[in-house]
A protein has these predicted regions:
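Glycine-biased, small-residue-rich flexible motifs in mid-sequence functional cores and linkers
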Residues: 1-3, 79-413
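Short, small/acidic-rich helices and loops at N termini and domain boundaries
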Residues: 1-81, 394, 400-401, 407-413
Length: 413
């Protein structure tokens, strides 16, 4: 039965998401739920006494007020019955009955949407990686879905904004409520709404209360194909996002970080337990989705690609002699000559994969794509091996775009 939108708003606002969906499934209509006799609520399994009382004293006054506010602030109300309700949400264990959205319309089922999450207490490394990965994902045609809280979420949002392409920010409170009440916080909210989309399960005017973040995380995961966790401590809410993704059958990707850093202890543990895929850049995530979105995903712009290895200078003719002024002896600055290290002689210090990657780095290959191609190491092992070499101090990652040997590696004898 097609129900007036205000009945959907009434039911979604009255009860928690899972309970509201259970009531809807019982009556198959929010109007029927609103008009039902009190004794019928006793037939719905799992309802508390308080929830039954709320249903018995039903009123549409608040729903009318919410819809008036939505109309005034140009906030869209997407209900379970609507054609543009994302199919991805319907597959959730407890799909929301209503989603509020402000900004550009977004057809999620057509998007290679990737969620990004991370700790609020992000390290400079975590903030940079969140920003760089979000930027590359967006430039390659993906839709970044993230939060707006300081730390990794905010860095990811800024990275996507820098590209000029759409993004989605999922809020715990209303889409009209800045998380930070400063002028910069208000400008950020307006900027995201202009360039992308703000979404929430909470009606307008709702503050960003701590108890709402679980529902926010469920929506974040539900709208996405996979989740990137940048940094998370042992008790970070980001681990809740990762668990939700696993429960919904979404792949989880993790950016490896310093073993001794408290802000990455949780994400590193996901890698240790083989519960997540290690990644170093956005392109590594999208490798799993090219076949599903062949016309939407594309290579990163040239400015974002990893640098290729330099071409060696042409060899001199076989019979040519070095040109030299008469009476002058050519001086060679021996310090400027690169030192060649045969990593193959160091099997007691490095694994075969490490030797192959270190040799490729020494030959001048710097991008992960080039390193994989020239070392012969499979992508999953290459990523984890490079990460371990970085932690041991033999490989440097000055930007997320390329890798180099460190002085420690070059000084090996």
């Amino acid at each position: 039965m097609y129900a007036s939108i205000k009945y959907w708003v009434w039911l979604a606002d009255l009860l928690p998401t899972a309970v509201g969906h259970r009531v809807y499934q019982f009556f198959n209509s929010p109007i029927e739920a609103f008009l039902a006799e009190p004794e019928r609520y006793d037939l719905i399994p799992g309802l508390t006494r308080q929830q039954k009382e709320l249903l018995c004293h039903a009123s549409l006054d608040r729903a009318d007020s919410i819809l008036e506010e939505c109309a005034r602030k140009e906030i869209r109300v997407v209900t379970w019955q609507d054609a543009d309700y994302p199919e991805r949400l319907r597959s959730m264990p407890a799909p929301p009955l209503v989603v509020y959205a402000q900004g550009r319309p977004c057809h999620f089922d057509d998007e290679a949407a990737i969620a990004m999450a991370g700790t609020r207490r992000a390290s400079p490394y975590g903030r940079r990686m969140a920003r760089d990965i979000a930027c590359e994902l967006t430039q390659m045609g993906s839709l970044v879905v993230t939060g707006i809280v300081a730390g990794c979420d905010l860095s990811a949002a800024r990275g996507a904004l820098e590209t000029g392409q759409p993004l989605v920010c999922v809020l715990a409170g209303g889409v009209d409520v800045p998380y930070y009440q400063s002028e910069s916080g208000k400008r950020l909210l307006a900027e995201i709404a202009e360039q992308g989309t703000l979404v929430s399960l909470s009606p307008p005017g709702t503050p960003h209360l701590g108890g709402l973040f679980r529902s926010r995380n469920e929506l974040l995961v539900g709208l996405s194909l996979g989740v990137v966790c940048v940094e998370a401590g042992q008790r970070s809410g980001t681990l809740q996002v990762a668990r939700m993704a696993m429960e919904q059958g979404r792949p989880v990707y993790v950016v490896p970080a310093n073993v001794g850093s408290p802000s990455s202890a949780g994400t590193n543990e996901l890698l240790r337990q083989n519960l997540a895929v290690p990644i170093l850049r956005g392109a590594h995530v999208l490798e799993d989705f090219y076949a599903q979105f062949p016309n939407r995903l594309h290579p990163a712009p040239r400015s974002q690609r990893h640098r290729s290895a330099p071409k060696p200078p042409p060899a001199p003719p076989a019979n040519s002699a070095p040109l030299q002024d008469k009476g002058t002896e050519k001086k060679v600055d021996s310090a400027s000559q690169p030192v060649y290290i045969d990593f193959h002689t160091r099997k007691n210090q490095f694994t075969d994969d490490e030797i192959a990657l270190l040799t490729a780095l020494q030959q001048g290959y710097e991008s992960m794509d080039d390193l994989i191609a020239h070392s012969g190491v499979p992508v999953d092992r290459a990523i984890s091996t490079i990460t371990l070499l970085s932690l041991r101090g033999f490989v440097d990652n000055p930007t997320s775009s390329y890798f180099t040997l460190t002085d420690q590696a070059k000084e090996l004898e």
